[in-house]
Amino acid sequence: MFNLLKPKGASKRRKIVGRGPGSGLGKTSGRGQKGQKARNTSPRLGFEGGQTPLYRRLPRKGFSNSDYKLEYAIVNLGDIDKKFKDGQVVNYDTLLENKLIKKKNKKIKILSNGKLTKKVSFEVSKISKSAESLVIKIGCTIQLV
């Protein structure tokens, strides 16, 4: 097991360049004669050989409002039904305890996927219309925070 040999040709020998004409890769080291690709460094990303690059030829367009975008943690009624008991309060802290949301999301939106059979009270940011009608039908209370 520990003295097995690799099959012939399994590992290639490293190419050693610039060590005289007898090696086959001496003098120019397989880079050809002169020019940009024969030199030491490669041009930066987006460089077009002195021509005005595409990113400078085209105008800037649009803007992003992503810094101020409100992101809601989405929780389904089915998940709440699995993790909560009758009479419990569904809010940021209890959802975090039950690992239904991640810490970074402060705003919560409830959606109507799944069935809710337990009578719980909600303290959330938003709730969908279909989820609201299902929750009210059961007799749960909703408080928008």
Curated annotation (Swiss-Prot):
Q: Which residues cross the membrane?
A: none
- Alphabetically ordered keywords of this record: Ribonucleoprotein, Ribosomal protein, RNA-binding, rRNA-binding
Question: What are the recorded GO MF terms, alphabetically?
Answer: rRNA binding; structural constituent of ribosome
Per the record, the GO terms for biological process are: translation
* Chain positions covered by the region annotation Disordered: 1-52
Q: Which Pfam families match?
A: Ribosomal_L27A
Which cellular component terms (GO) are annotated to the entry?
A: cytosolic large ribosomal subunit
**InterPro entries per UniProt:** Ribosomal_uL15, Ribosomal_uL15/eL18, Ribosomal_uL15/eL18_sf, Ribosomal_uL15_bac-type, Ribosomal_uL15_CS
Q: Is rRNA-binding among the key words of this record? A: yes
* Taxonomic superkingdom: Bacteria
Q: Where is the composition biased (Gly residues)?
A: 19-33
Family per UniProt?
A: Belongs to the universal ribosomal protein uL15 family.
Record function comment:
Binds to the 23S rRNA.
Listed under subunit, the entry gives:
Part of the 50S ribosomal subunit.
What's the name of the protein? Large ribosomal subunit protein uL15
The record lists the lineage as: Bacteria, Pseudomonadati, Spirochaetota, Spirochaetia, Spirochaetales
